[in-house]
From Swiss-Prot:
Pfam families: DUF5884 (PF19231)
InterPro entries the UniProt entry points to: DUF5884
Identification of the protein by name: Uncharacterized protein R898
Organism the protein comes from: Acanthamoeba polyphaga mimivirus (APMV)
Family: Belongs to the mimivirus L885/R898 family.
Length: 201
């Protein structure tokens, strides 16, 4: 059975590669975008607490670094959006300056004071964070917890932490290619390494 699966997979890949050889630049750019999006989703799937897995409809990530006309003097802009059931979403926008250091491309946050938005219907709630300091303390206000209500998730202490982990990981992974590897991504099984503070808005 394993040999049949391997053969089928090999034939499918050969078919895909044969089609790719017939494509023009515009088609190749579209395929590259789809591949990068799929890679991002596969990377991020392990960062999603289980209570949200069945609630997520789509995830979209875009980096200006993937633009074929990009130059390092342009800096990098990253956008992330996660859409849930019941007209809810989380989105984040980040900008970075870029420079070369010893031949390696380096990134610096343009502004350490950033925010992530939680959208519920027509209302938007904002969580502010310090890009330099977010790995140790993460403040989540009561407005952010409304997402749990909208998704019919109980606001237990454990589920609040799961929301904190989801938001934390969105911040950690919404980076230019390879940059997020220097940031810890919180394990969904062990969230005792960070202090989540829940406070009224």
């Amino acid at each position: 059975m394993n040999e049949l699966i391997y053969f089928d997979r090999k034939k499918r890949l050969e078919s895909i590669l044969n089609h790719i050889k017939k494509l023009d630049y515009d088609d190749l750019r579209q395929i590259k975008k789809a591949i990068l999006q799929q890679e991002f989703e596969l990377d991020f799937n392990s960062c999603i607490p289980i209570i949200f897995e069945t609630k997520i409809k789509t995830m979209k990530y875009k980096s200006s670094h993937d633009n074929p006309n990009w130059e390092y003097s342009d800096g990098i802009k990253c956008k992330f959006k996660m859409e849930f059931d019941n007209d809810c979403s989380i989105d984040l926008y980040c900008e970075y300056t870029t420079y070369y250091d010893g031949g390696d491309l380096e990134y610096t946050d343009i502004d350490n004071n950033r925010s992530i938005n939680i959208n519920i219907g027509q209302k938007t709630y904002t969580i502010d964070f310090d890009a330099d300091n977010y790995q140790t303390i993460f403040v989540i206000n009561n407005d952010a917890l409304k997402l749990l209500d909208s998704l019919s998730i109980d606001k237990s202490d454990s589920n609040k932490k799961c929301l904190g982990i989801l938001i934390y990981n969105i911040v950690g992974i919404t980076k230019p290619e390879d940059y997020h590897e220097s940031f810890d991504i919180m394990s969904c099984d062990n969230f005792d390494d960070i202090v989540f503070i829940y406070e009224p808005y």
